[in-house]
Amino acid sequence: MMRKWLYSTNHKDIGTLYFMFGIWAGMVGTSLSLLIRAELGNPGSLIGDDQIYNTIVTAHAFIMIFFMVMPIMIGGFGNWLVPLMLGAPDMAFPRMNNMSFWLLPPSIMLLISSSIVENGAGTGWTVYPPLSSNIAHSGSSVDLAIFSLHLAGISSILGAVNFITTIINMRPNNMSLDQMPLFVWSVGITALLLLLSLPVLAGAITMLLTDRNLNTSFFDPAGGGDPILYQHLFWFFGHPEVYILILPGFGMISHIISQESGKKETFGCLGMIYAMMAIGLLGFVVWAHHMFTVGMDIDTRAYFTSATMIIAVPTGIKIFSWLATLHGTQINYSPSMLWSLGFVFLFTVGGLTGVILANSSIDVTLHDTYYVVAHFHYVLSMGAVFAIMGGFVHWYPLFTGLALNPYLLKIQFFTMFIGVNLTFFPQHFLGLAGMPRRYSDYPDTYTSWNIISSLGSYISLIATMLMLMIIWESLINKRIILFPLNMNSSIEWYQNLPPAEHSYNELPILSNF
């Protein structure tokens, strides 16, 4: 039993490990976010000073991004579904796949230890120098966080190489690239983004490490360095990263919507592929829109404003194609469909606030206020997380062969929907009123919206616990699925439920596409 899980080279077992790790990390990250909202629930300080507060904020961001969303979306859904959807017997490099997973537990341990030794890394997830220099953050906290990022980065790069190789080499004989399922495409593009952006982050944080410990001056003006260089390097990774977090979600939503609509494929399949490629490409040329306040040239700001707005075009193509897929169907409000509809609506809202922030002139005012927090939590907490939830309840019968309770799932969806909206909608108002980010306290003027926001976070907590209870109930009661209720336009539903340990002993052949 021990050997099965420690030395596994089976994509399904490794996918399950990723799910368990991601759910655990998600609970840690959620606890941290509740500490943040408890601190901000009333004026005055509750937990302590801004150092401990910012340490909590930093850990919350890193855990949610690197140990919850990425492991579940790419590691969990990617590992499980990509080989099944391609008709491949496993991933291209099964042992490397195992290593990708086992680099994550040491990585999260380093991250957690960074917040419990010395004063913690209170730098925000961006780890900007000079705040992250050895003067402002003496001690080993930031160094531990850097090593944690290195491990998580190596894990993701190895995973990316694995997915790219699998997708290029392990398709059925006569399946062309444009015939691949959209989820496989989305994971492939995500892997490419990871492969191109993570080495830049590794370079940036390695330079920061030597600045802190070996007396170099990459980011120290006293020695001829420039802290702005760090920001450029970080955001050259950081912006593709946010698309890495959402693209697999796009793929899952495409599958769920077409299946639940009873359509054989998504509307504008090829357009969806090109839209994802465009989003991936454009994601690399807009990074400095995170830096409108550092004093760039007017023409530079004009370029980054325009380029950022162009991303709205392929994103809009995706939104309208999903709506077109839904068109003319009698919508069946199943739990996975509810998550998808919630995703499309809330992701659009988050996207619109993004277009507002893309204007460099307006962003000077809104930068580092709660407006930005509201924007990215709409696309992450209601985009990425809704996609994860929708994908989970949609494919859970395939992964386990068991049924979840749909009635409880609907209650859970509406609880979560109310919770996240109540948490993050008021933050738009706080941002417009000028409440800055990353402070543990605020003037009394902002009290009312903060109380409402914190109330929403407690509702989300109840929803999260309800989800865990639903999964537990399903595993205890073991309502075994006799046959899938799905359209078999996606090949993964032709498996046994759950699939056999080795699903494709002979390779499938494509016919009548």
From Swiss-Prot:
It catalyses: 4 Fe(II)-[cytochrome c] + O2 + 8 H(+)(in) = 4 Fe(III)-[cytochrome c] + 2 H2O + 4 H(+)(out). CDD domains: Cyt_c_Oxidase_I. It comes from the Eukaryota. It comes from Choristoneura pinus. Gene3D superfamilies: Cytochrome c oxidase-like, subunit I domain. O2 binds at Y243. It holds the Pfam family COX1. One of its GO terms (biological process) is mitochondrial electron transport, cytochrome c to oxygen. Keywords: Calcium, Copper, Electron transport, Heme, Iron, Magnesium, Membrane, Metal-binding, Mitochondrion, Mitochondrion inner membrane, Respiratory chain, Translocase, Transmembrane, Transmembrane helix, Transport. Its main location: mitochondrion. There is a cross-link at H239-Y243 (1'-histidyl-3'-tyrosine (His-Tyr)). It is a multi-pass membrane protein. Mg(2+) binds at H367, D368. The chain crosses the membrane at residues 16-36, 62-82, 101-121, 144-164, 182-202, 233-253, 267-287, 304-324, 337-357, 384-404, 413-433, 451-471. This is Cytochrome c oxidase subunit 1. It is found in: Mitochondrion inner membrane. Fe(II)-heme a binds at H60, H377.
